[in-house]
Amino acid sequence: MTTHVAPQAKDWYQAKDSDTGYQKVIGYMPAAHGLTLAQNDIIQMVKVGIGTIITDVILLTGAMGSSVTADVGDVTNGESIYISAADVSGNSITYMESVDLVGVPFTYTVADTIDVHFEAATPASDQAFSLIVGYITGVDITP
């Protein structure tokens, strides 16, 4: 298992600074970035700041390979998983609205990334996938 970082998740990348908006990583193809994916690889896709609430998550994929599934969220520590075990073996669109899988909005208390985790089989590195994340920022998290 390897963790890869998409350009939008790197330290130097500045996310939109409005109170609400969408962060998009469109047409990310691992092979175009010199990557060969393996089963259980994680790709950090979008940076999120302190006080961010995620409102929507959309994952679009090409045919990632037989039996491949994907999780989307903070997959390294499991605090917020927005899409779980989505079948991405063929072309797919998976959408999550408003809340993570535990049923309540998750507010980030530290800066983090939203990741895509390919499971169950080795995903195709020559297939593009896109992640669109809707968010609200500037939420006051002080008690």
Feature roles, as predicted:
Residues T2-P143:
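Surface-exposed, low-hydrophobicity beta-strand/loop segments enriched in small/polar/acidic residues
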